């Protein structure tokens, strides 16, 4: 019997081959045992603080917003070791891997950020890492591939399907099915079968907890809105978790509208998708009338995923969080604007959240505090952006 809820309303669940159920049950048990173990929590917190660099800063933007009624803050996950929020939960799951007595880690990666975080945690904790990456993403994200190899991880390009994140997840799950006795599948987002969405949320929830404490200290009140980009949705759920029970705080998730949600080229799963099962969970997915998974698209490899974490599906369903979409063009504009106005180069993923937050700031008619989760830094995207913008910089 599962001790944790396996679902969020009708969403979530464990739609996996029978042979993986014991591995998922073992993971849930390890997670619950670890939660009650002071030495585990102490080690996790000490790694977050002394290795990863938490708490991360909360920066009030100075020049970005022209509306005098708006204060726009950035939660600086881009300053975390590894370059993005990914490091938080990866350290937690890597510690769980050791706790379960396993020596190997299997992971998938899109932008390469989760792969880098997995590689650094495995290097630190003496685990062997096998990282699956879509062949197309291997090309798009060369610096991250080199980083992973430098830290001792094996990077396996996946040519199947469209050669992107979805295909990498399929291969990683196939590997895990064959090797779950010795290897832990370190899922990189708040999606997939139970207990992954819950574990990933809990190991990212310090993002929202720190945000609450920092904004109370700076402003003496909670923010009016927290805004985060949503691919699978791990940085967003980490930001939202501590505010779900605060009805005065708007939770805004920003999906990739790609070349426009009216085209076929986007990844706006909640905004345009329908309910179905992908990678072990019932959630919103992008599928055609026959139920075939459609290809998602985004300028940012990390948002290019045709499903979404089940808790986001649930928060949308009950109306607690709102989900919108920002186009490639809007994200690229926000990317350049933050660099020019504040001297901070954000990841293309985070630029989607920023783009929508800037629209919210323009429209605000009363005193408003907005916090954007700046989930990662843009170093990994520079070559990609230069290719797109060319001489227009």
UniProtKB/Swiss-Prot annotation:
Catalysed transformations (reactions): (1S,2R)-1-C-(indol-3-yl)glycerol 3-phosphate + L-serine = D-glyceraldehyde 3-phosphate + L-tryptophan + H2O
GO CC term, one of those recorded: cytoplasm
Keywords of this entry: Amino-acid biosynthesis, Aromatic amino acid biosynthesis, Lyase, Pyridoxal phosphate, Tryptophan biosynthesis
Modification N6-(pyridoxal phosphate)lysine occurs at: 86
Source domain of life: Bacteria
Cofactors (names): pyridoxal 5'-phosphate
Pathway(s) it belongs to: Amino-acid biosynthesis; L-tryptophan biosynthesis; L-tryptophan from chorismate: step 5/5
Pfam hit, one: PALP
EC numbers, comma separated: 4.2.1.20
UniProt xrefs under InterPro entries: Trp_synth_b_CS (IPR006653), Trp_synth_beta (IPR006654), Trp_synth_beta/beta-like (IPR023026), TrpB-like_PALP (IPR001926), TrpB-like_PALP_sf (IPR036052)
GO molecular function, one term: tryptophan synthase activity
Gene3D superfamilies xref list: 3.40.50.1100
Top enzyme class: lyase
Family: Belongs to the TrpB family.
Role noted for this protein: The beta subunit is responsible for the synthesis of L-tryptophan from indole and L-serine.
Assembly and binders: Tetramer of two alpha and two beta chains.
Name of the protein described by the UniProt record: Tryptophan synthase beta chain
The species this protein was found in: Alteromonas mediterranea (strain DSM 17117 / CIP 110805 / LMG 28347 / Deep ecotype)
Lineage: Bacteria, Pseudomonadati, Pseudomonadota, Gammaproteobacteria, Alteromonadales
Gene encoding the protein: trpB
